[in-house]
Every structure is written in structure tokens, then in C-alpha cells.
């Protein structure tokens, strides 16, 4: 049975404790006083796989409508979402990664941790200096830097960067 969520601004809240606990145990959302707060990528992914039903008032919102609403808030949402959904399908558990200057930090198993920078092939330019700056942000953590490049067809390529000390 799908959890019930309520669209509040650009966030989705799951207020039912049982639903919230079930999702949180799968590394979705962030607990708050108002319920489990899902960020847009999580909410859309859960809708698409049938684990969440989102409503605004009494009106059920389809995954397509949810995508449209999130794009209104952030035109780059589909690019980030493509990476988020791909990581989830590959067994990773992505969370927001802003403190690393990346879109996501993701976990898989006990030891695998990555910080994922998302770039859109046709729009985002970056230099070797940018890569060094991103590496500095993850330096001293257990995270490995991964750059996800999304093309106009939403095909993804992942590149792993690390600093080689000689």
C-alpha cells in the first residue's frame, strides 16, 4: 500500500507515523515536527515506483503533475532528478549534498559513499580548477567525488575523480 503524502509548497509531507517510519527506514526523507519531509526528487521517485500517493488538499497529483510543479520551482529539476532516479535504481541511497558543494551524497552498503556533482552537458562548463575545488570539499571525508554529466536526452555518464599524491 502506498504511503500518503501532502504537497506543501515545494515539499511533500508524510504525516502518518507508520508510513513515515517505513519510508525513513529506507533512507527517504527528513523527520520534522510536521511529519516526514520528502525533498522533491524523493517524492517524485516514490510516486513513480508506486510507494507514495501525493495530494494537494483532496486532489490526487499524478507524477507528471508533480514533475511540472517541481520544474516551476526549479527549471534544472529534471536534470537532477534523472541522476537521483538512476542512483536509486542502481542501489544507492542519495541525500542532499550541499555541504560538499554537490547535489547529492549517496550511500550503498556499509563502505560505499560518493558525493555527486550534477552537470548538464550543453549548459554547464567546468574547468580542471573547478574539479580541484570540488575535490577539496570532499577531502578528509569518506566520500569519493563523482561527476554526473547529463546530456539533452537525459543519458548519464559518471566520472570518478580523486587527487593523486606522489
UniProtKB/Swiss-Prot annotation:
User: What GO terms are given for molecular function?
Assistant: nucleic acid binding; tRNA-intron endonuclease activity
GO biological process: any one? Answer: tRNA splicing, via endonucleolytic cleavage and ligation
Segments spanning the bilayer are none
Q: Which cysteines are joined by disulfide bonds?
A: none
Which residues does UniProt assign to the signal peptide? none
Protein name, please? EndA-like protein
- Which species does the entry assign this protein to? Methanopyrus kandleri (strain AV19 / DSM 6324 / JCM 9639 / NBRC 100938)
Record's GO cellular component, any one?
cytoplasm
- Family stated for the protein in its record: Belongs to the tRNA-intron endonuclease family. Archaeal short subfamily.
